[in-house]
Amino acid sequence: MLDIIKQIESQYIRTDLPNFNIGDTVKVHVRIKEGNRQRVQVFEGIVLKRQNGGVRETFTVRRVAYGVGVERTFPVNAPIIEKIQVVRRGKVRRAKLYYLRDRVGKAAKVKEILK
């Protein structure tokens, strides 16, 4: 039974997206439909968490816009995501970065992995 589910789900898993981890700064290009028009909106921020796996995998991106923290959760395999760009690789020691919600300014920064 599980093999059948995995086989069906494998058809919907996207392979065109880059590998990104928690703590990375990413630009998510989201397709938005307004009436009969479509446009692409870019949401840039730090990846706070990744949840689940397979087709149901989601990730949450946080940014501070005009002094207000904004978090958006995206399904990884959703067709509304046009592309994901990794801007910076972050070095973190946690799987969930909820502590960044309480931090302001430089304290909310994540160390960058230098190549």
UniProtKB/Swiss-Prot annotation:
Residue ranges of coiled coil: none
InterPro entries: Ribosomal_bL19, Ribosomal_bL19_CS, Ribosomal_bL19_sf, Translation_prot_SH3-like_sf
Entry keyword set: Ribonucleoprotein, Ribosomal protein
Gene3D superfamilies given in the database record: 2.30.30.790
One Pfam family named in its UniProt record: Ribosomal_L19
GO BP of this protein: translation
Sample GO molecular function, one term: structural constituent of ribosome
Any one Gene Ontology cellular component term annotated for this protein: cytosolic large ribosomal subunit
Entry keyword Ribosomal protein: yes
Protein's job: This protein is located at the 30S-50S ribosomal subunit interface and may play a role in the structure and function of the aminoacyl-tRNA binding site.
UniProt record similarity statement: Belongs to the bacterial ribosomal protein bL19 family.
Matches recorded under HAMAP family: Ribosomal_bL19
NCBIfam families from the UniProt entry: rplS_bact
Stated name of the protein: Large ribosomal subunit protein bL19
